[in-house]
Amino acid sequence: MGLTETTLVLVSLAFFASAVAHNCQNGTRPASEEKREGCDYYCWNAETNSWDKFFFGNGERCFYNDGGEGLCQNGECHLTTDSSVPNDSDV
């Protein structure tokens, strides 16, 4: 394989990897993560052969498996529904 063919293959692979990664970035909820509890999610990184951790954007709807619902803020799910957990005003 000559230099031109090798370059073409590498450029094609880089384009494919960037197209796949485009669906998995901070603030963008991939369809595969619609049922994920909390505000973080993982996407496979083919270049490093490992999982990259991302976070939903601020204001994105989130939930807990116990039925609690909230909004993401700085990577954490802040409940907006009563979860029957004591808070400061309950003491």
From Swiss-Prot:
UniProt PTM: Glycosylated; deglycosylation largely abrogates the complement inhibitory effect.
InterPro entries according to UniProt: Ixonnexin-like
Pfam annotation, one family: TSGP1
Subcellular location(s) of the protein: Secreted
Keywords carried by this UniProt record: Complement system impairing toxin, Glycoprotein, Secreted, Signal, Toxin
Observed effect of gene inactivation: (Microbial infection) RNAi-mediated knockdown results in decreased loads of B.burgdorferi (strain N40) in nymph midguts after blood feeding. Reduced transmission of B.burgdorferi from ticks to mice.
Domain of life: Eukaryota
MF term (GO), any: toxin activity
Residues listed as glycosylation sites in the UniProt record: 26, 87
Tissues showing expression: Nymph salivary gland (at protein level). Saliva (at protein level). Not detected in midgut.
Main subcellular location: secreted
Listed GO CC annotations: extracellular region
Other remarks in the entry: Immunization of mice against the protein reduces B.burgdorferi loads in mouse tissues after infection and acquisition of parasites from Borrelia-infected hosts by ticks.
Function text: Inhibits the lectin pathway of complement system activation in the host by reducing binding of mannose-binding lectin and L-ficolin to their ligands. Does not affect the classical and alternative pathways of complement system activation in the host. (Microbial infection) Protects Borrelia garinii (strain A87S) from host complement-mediated killing by preventing deposition of host C5b-9 membrane attack complexes on the surface of spirochetes. Inhibits phagocytosis of B.garinii (strain A87S) by human neutrophils. Impairs Borrelia-induced complement-mediated chemotaxis of human polymorphonuclear leukocytes.
Family indicated by similarity: Belongs to the salp14 family.
Name used for this protein in its record: Salivary lectin pathway inhibitor
Phylogenetic lineage: Eukaryota, Metazoa, Ecdysozoa, Arthropoda, Chelicerata
